[in-house]
UniProtKB/Swiss-Prot annotation:
Provenance organism: Leptospira biflexa serovar Patoc (strain Patoc 1 / ATCC 23582 / Paris)
Subunit annotation: Homotetramer.
Domain of life: Bacteria
GO MF term set: chorismate synthase activity; FMN binding
Gene behind the chain: aroC
Entry keyword annotation includes Metal-binding: no
Classification lineage: Bacteria, Pseudomonadati, Spirochaetota, Spirochaetia, Leptospirales
Gene3D superfamilies according to UniProt: Chorismate synthase AroC
Residue numbers spanned by region Disordered: 37-60
Official protein name in the record: Chorismate synthase
Family that this chain belongs to: Belongs to the chorismate synthase family.
The entry's keywords: Amino-acid biosynthesis, Aromatic amino acid biosynthesis, FAD, Flavoprotein, FMN, Lyase, NADP
Record pathway: Metabolic intermediate biosynthesis; chorismate biosynthesis; chorismate from D-erythrose 4-phosphate and phosphoenolpyruvate: step 7/7
Annotated Pfam families: Chorismate_synt (PF01264)
Amino acid sequence: MPSSWGKIFRVSTFGESHGTSVGVVVDGVPAGLPFPEEEIQKDLTRRRPGQNDLTTPRDEKDRMVVESGVFEGKTTGSPILMKVNNQNTIGSDYDEMAHVFRPSHADYTYSEKYGHRAHVGGGRSSVRETIGRVAAAGLARVILENELGISTVGFVDSIGPIDSNITEDEYPISRDLVDQFPTRCPKASANEEMETLIRKLRDEGDSVGGVVKVVVRNLPPGLGDPVYDKLDADLAKAILSISACKGFEVGSGFSGTRQTGSTHNDEFYIEEGTGKVKTRTNRSGGIQGGISNGMDLVIRAAFKPTSTIKKEQKTINDQNKETILKAKGRHDPCVLPRAVPIVEAVVNLVLVDAYLYQRALQPKWFMKYANLNAIPNQ
């Protein structure tokens, strides 16, 4: 079961929902980097369960433990192991699911592929796997912010039929603003409607999906490679690997198919004062030909409704007999509020790997775009 990602900044996650712990081993972190323990813990707290009544009532504090790769507050260049101990597990909630497959869940496909599965909490298919990715991305964010000045902010763009209707004119949106709203939709009117919808469906034993939008500012041109290692292809694979994610788009995405070339093309110009190459619109979402073009990277990720719900559903068991399931346990009625820091994290993991790869292969590019004073041991 593959559990690793990256060429240079390599991330390997481990653990299961109801196991002893979940975590990550990160290879390729440069030595001498100040270890951002407090910032990583803040990121983990943003994604943890039990934040409010819109999320699962499972109350995990998700306190990080660092076991290697850090000495006297700085990275050593050796693999960094970070983990979180699972503390609030109730395995008996899943007794019925030992032999019954939840509709639209990974239960059936894991069983068919491996012939044996950890049914409690969904095992590796649980969103708790992303704890390791969020922890690793805390390191990635330090590199990206310090060396390139990059800012990555995500927010909930829609839940069910309710759209945020946030436009580019309202950028930049700060993480502090996003976190003021329980749904992480930074538009007060839409947030209120979303809260009402989530609570209604939760009380009915149902769930709802939606879309997370992420905007990356100050991304330099040149990241990504043509054909098979395109930046948008890497982002798509990484983001679609998040539990419950079913769709991905960059820039105009599918809506661009409704336009003509003359209306969709992003015209270039030279920015007065800086001499930088810019585009008058950003329908490309910051990527052209699989390579960043210096404009904001704009992506959207679609999440399906949580598959484990308390309403009765028709399904089958592992004896190929039809049956009825009314799931027990503690589950998110909507994953979107907690998905925001997860999608941000995955975006940063892809970007830091692309940056370190470009930095190694293209010294002239590195000298042109990186803040050399922020790089340890230089």
